[in-house]
Swiss-Prot record:
Matches recorded under PANTHER family: PHOTOSYSTEM I REACTION CENTER SUBUNIT VIII, PTHR35775
Coiled-coil stretches: none
Membrane topology, as annotated: Single-pass membrane protein
Protein name as catalogued: Photosystem I reaction center subunit VIII
Keywords annotated in UniProt: Chloroplast, Membrane, Photosynthesis, Photosystem I, Plastid, Thylakoid, Transmembrane, Transmembrane helix
Underlying gene: psaI
Signal peptide location: none
Entry's transmembrane regions: 9-29
Entry keyword annotation includes Acyltransferase: no
Family assignment from sequence similarity: Belongs to the PsaI family.
């Protein structure tokens, strides 16, 4: 049961949280260095 339930929580978490952190860090990097 745990093996079937864990991916159903873990996959959306990685799929949503990781891109959000990547976009946030990228926007902070651009704002600091003023590339745009």
């Amino acid at each position: 049961m745990i093996d079937l339930n864990f991916p159903s929580i873990f996959v959306p978490l990685v799929g949503l949280v990781f891109p959000a952190i990547a976009m946030a860090s990228l926007s902070l990097y651009v704002q600091r260095n003023k590339i745009v």
